[in-house]
Amino acid sequence: MYHYIEDKVFLKDMKYLCSNIINQLVQLINNDSLMEVKAHLVGSGAKNLITQNSNEPIDLDCNLMIIDSEININNCREIKEYIRKQFNVILNKNGWNDCMDSTSVLTTEKRHFTKGNHTEFSIDLAIVFNDRNGCHRLIHEKTGVTAWDRYYWNSVPDSRNLFDKVAAIKDEHLWDEVIDEYLEKKNMYLRRQDYNHPSFNVYVETVNQVFNKYFD
């Protein structure tokens, strides 16, 4: 079952290392002329939402949000390929291997610290953008034949005004309820063997549930 990471030293070191790599990626892309992006760990604005399933490796979920793009926003294949190549530049520069292109994220190799906590961890980088309808996540649907693969934007349900809802919850000092409910939902989907709810979707679902309970 999922639990929150209690080793604060390990958590701090892992977040520092991975955030540094992601920040380098953001700077590399923003210094180019094709795209403007920003990045954040899923739920990291509120902290304390990094989970681990039993003793398995930790997936550090990060959203790379497109703010502006010279590449047509609907050209999902070109967008993902551009970001994948830039990500590999940064990973290689830091001594990491190339990332893997999965359906909804770019996944790094698993790493671990040589001192202290030896738990393995990796970065799962999702490519997203926001519009008036909410948040959309870039999907690469693989067919087995590269030329036939599909790339498209998948809407995250009920993600409209997410940041405003988070701010309202924090202002009323209700974030502990989000922390409790988020973990409960992660374990609920695990028990159901439902693997169609990425961490960000669970986060959005949790924020909406708490917001609707107190503000709707």
Segment roles from a protein language model:
Residues 28-35, 77-133:
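Conserved catalytic core of two-metal-ion nucleotidyltransferases
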Residues 3-18, 72, 76, 196-200, ...:
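Intrinsic-disorder-associated interaction segments
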Residues 47-49, 67, 81, 99, ...:
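Predominantly extracellular/lumenal beta-strand repeat domains
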Residues 1-41:
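Helical scaffold of the NTase/Pol beta-like nucleotidyltransferase catalytic core
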Residues 115-216:
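Right-hand nucleic-acid polymerase module
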Residues 24-42, 92-107, 192-205, 214-216:
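Short glycine-rich, low-complexity/disordered patches
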Residues 29-60, 64-73:
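Active-site nucleotide-donor binding segment shared across nucleotidyl transfer reactions
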